[in-house]
UniProtKB/Swiss-Prot annotation:
Domain-related comment: Has a two-domain beta-structure, folded into four very similar Greek key motifs.
Gene that this sequence comes from: CRYBA2
Quaternary structure and partners: Homo/heterodimer, or complexes of higher-order. The structure of beta-crystallin oligomers seems to be stabilized through interactions between the N-terminal arms.
Stretches the record annotates as N-terminal arm: 1-11
An annotated GO BP: visual perception
Species per Swiss-Prot/TrEMBL record: Homo sapiens (Human)
Taxonomic path: Eukaryota, Metazoa, Chordata, Craniata, Vertebrata
Protein known as: Beta-crystallin A2
């Protein structure tokens, strides 16, 4: 007598609307979308519902601009995804699922200098304030994601610009802060958390 294999995670999916509060035209995504205006026919995205998986949204087409982590749940307007970010975006134009968001096995190493040089700090848990946990600098020069997926923030308390860090992108290696995203103009990272799957 054989038992059925355990079901894997449901495929990533989210629904987008061109107006706040889940109104107007909508489009459902199951995979990467470099430009929702072209692929989904929406002029803009003003509300989002994540049904499965974890997604990263970008304010511009082709995965450019500010990044916003979208975990399972409802985002009825821009303030729901911008949160306490110092940069508010009232539109999202490209989306992709986050890879390897395994909350049970997450590990990242921060380095003071570029190319994995200088003092290092190994993390396996959420840190709302890196300085209060012993990280002496407000900047991170480089980092390696050994497992899982993380969101790093510019300021303590999970505020400011967001940077989604995945083991399966860049082989988990970010040699300089410029590799964190197109909006990364400084290496200032002061809080970090594991992606909630």
């Amino acid at each position: 007598m054989s038992s059925a294999p355990a079901p894997g995670p449901a495929p990533a999916s989210l629904t987008l609307w061109d107006e706040e509060d889940f109104q107007g035209r909508r489009c459902r995504l199951l995979s990467d979308c470099a430009n929702v205006c072209e692929r989904g026919g929406l002029p803009r995205v003003r509300s989002v519902k994540v049904e499965n998986g974890v997604w990263v949204a970008f304010e511009y087409p082709d995965f450019q601009g500010q990044q916003f982590i979208l975990e399972k749940g409802d985002y009825p307007r821009w303030s729901a995804w911008s949160g306490s970010s110092s940069h508010n975006s009232n539109q999202l134009l490209s989306f992709r699922p986050v890879l390897c968001a395994n909350h049970n096995d997450s590990r990242v190493t921060l380095f003071e200098g570029d190319n994995f040089q200088g003092c290092k700090f190994d993390l396996v848990d959420d840190y709302p304030s890196l300085p209060s946990m012993g990280w002496a600098s407000k900047d991170v020069g480089s980092l390696k994601v050994s497992s899982g997926a993380w969101v790093a923030y510019q300021y303590p308390g999970y505020r400011g610009y967001q940077y989604v860090l995945e083991r399966d992108r860049h082989s988990g290696e970010f040699c300089t802060y410029g590799e964190l995203g197109t909006q990364a103009h400084t290496g200032q990272l002061q809080s970090i958390r594991r992606v909630q799957h």
